[in-house]
């Protein structure tokens, strides 16, 4: 089974959502990407359709935007 990818920016809202996602779907089923520290993954997230973080991209390619922490434009600086 392919993993979901959870993108976030490292803020407290995002880290809280990360813990909830891991609890809900299991650590083995999700790859966590902190865009704040892995800036080289911004283009990947945008290509997947992520407009803001935190967001979960499902194995089927659906983007679930969770709450609102920061826009991708904000993360680019």
Model-derived features: positions:
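Local sequence-structure signature of Cys/Sec-based thiol-disulfide redox active-site neighborhoods
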Residues: 1-28
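Structural micro-motif
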Residues: 46-57
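Residues that form or flank phosphate/diphosphate-binding pockets in enzymes
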Residues: 15, 40, 66
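Ligand-binding grooves and catalytic loops that recognize ribose/phosphate and carbohydrate rings
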Residues: 42-43, 48, 68
């Amino acid at each position: 089974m392919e993993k979901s990818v959870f993108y976030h920016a490292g803020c407290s809202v995002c880290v809280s959502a990360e813990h909830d996602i891991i609890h809900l779907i299991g650590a083995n089923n999700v790859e966590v990407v902190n865009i704040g520290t892995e800036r080289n993954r911004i283009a990947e997230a945008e290509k997947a359709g992520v407009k803001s973080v935190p967001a979960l991209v499902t194995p089927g390619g659906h983007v679930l935007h969770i709450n609102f922490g920061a826009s991708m434009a904000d993360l680019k600086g």
